[in-house]
């Protein structure tokens, strides 16, 4: 009888049921592990590892925090980008700002996520916040990729 009374009480309050459901869902999601790496991304867990990753060539670093919802949303997209053939000449790295505070401090990271572009050990550009379009644009620019084909194959060129 008590169970039926409780069910009837909850059914009469759909907004409360929705709020309870959302609360329980957020609690479950917050306990899921943060995807530190994926694709071709490499984690830097110390200053030495960070320095080794950015030392040569082009490196894109994702400065993230495990408690940051935009960082969690960006992680799978960042991992997929790292697997794209067009970006194979770029190293994709991740730095947990709470774990490697010295790197976050030395790179003046104050908002998460922040994506830093490093060329031969020196930061050249950064994107604060996650914008896949901006990051792709910067990667295309740094790798000198043509997003528009100025020289189409001869079959497609106009013949007079």
Where are these regions (language model features)?
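Hydrophobic heptad-repeat coiled-coil signature
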Residues: 68-71
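Non-catalytic, surface beta->alpha helical segment in thiol-disulfide oxidoreductase systems
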Residues: 110-153
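Short active-site neighborhood of thiol/selenol oxidoreductases, capturing the structured segment around
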Residues: 54-66
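N-terminal signal-anchor transmembrane helix
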Residues: 31-54
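Intrinsic disorder/low-complexity signal
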Residues: 1-7, 39-40, 145-160
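N-terminal targeting signals for export/organelle localization
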Residues: 1-38
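Short acidic active-site motifs
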Residues: 49, 99-103, 134
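Thiol-based oxidoreductase modules, predominantly thioredoxin-like and allied folds used
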Residues: 63, 74-102
């Amino acid at each position: 009888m008590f169970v039926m009374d409780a069910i009837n009480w909850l059914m009469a309050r759909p907004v409360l049921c929705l709020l309870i459901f959302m609360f329980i869902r957020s609690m479950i999601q917050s306990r899921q592990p943060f995807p530190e790496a994926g694709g071709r991304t490499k984690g830097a867990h110390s200053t030495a590892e960070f320095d080794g990753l950015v030392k040569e060539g082009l490196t894109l670093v994702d400065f993230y925090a495990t408690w940051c919802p935009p960082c969690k949303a960006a992680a799978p997209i960042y991992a997929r980008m790292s697997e794209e053939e067009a970006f194979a000449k770029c190293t994709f790295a991740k730095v947990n700002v709470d774990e490697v505070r010295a790197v976050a401090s030395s790179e003046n990271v104050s908002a998460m996520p922040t994506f830093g572009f490093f060329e031969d050990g020196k930061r050249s550009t950064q994107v604060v916040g996650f914008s896949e379009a901006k990051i792709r644009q910067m990667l295309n620019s740094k790798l000198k990729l043509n997003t528009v084909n100025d020289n189409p194959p001869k079959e497609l060129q106009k013949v007079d």
